[in-house]
Amino acid sequence: MNTVSVVQFLAVGCAVFVLYGRGVFAAEGVKKAGQHKDAELCLGSDGLGHRLDEFWYNDDMCQRFLCFKDDEGIMYEQIANCPIAIAEGDCTLKPGRRATTQTVRPAVESPP
């Protein structure tokens, strides 16, 4: 079987639909970051402190997180999921690799 990234799907001839948000992740939402003992760190969903503009990942859920500060100085945690992909015809969809590879993409497998 051929395995290709969705960026290469035209070469395989399978119909693939991919919904992308910012970059390779589909933005899911933003929430106010919790208060960490160090005021310059975001308290992430993972319970750890993260520096401003730092990315961290949950590979099991294929999620990427970002700590940022708005114009008023309030820290937020941005949560983004991997893109959604649909394969049609004889093609099958393989889940994306780990979220820590910033080029996460689902893959499409086509029959030989």
From Swiss-Prot:
Signal peptide annotation: 1-26
Coiled coil residues, start to end: none
Record's GO cellular component terms: extracellular region
Modification comment: Contains 2 disulfide bonds.
Key words, A-Z: Disulfide bond, Secreted, Signal, Toxin
Tissue: Expressed by the venom gland.
Compartments where found: Secreted
GO molecular function, one term: toxin activity
Main location: secreted
Protein family membership: Belongs to the scoloptoxin-16 family.
Protein name from the UniProt record: U-scoloptoxin(16)-Er5a
Organism (species): Ethmostigmus rubripes
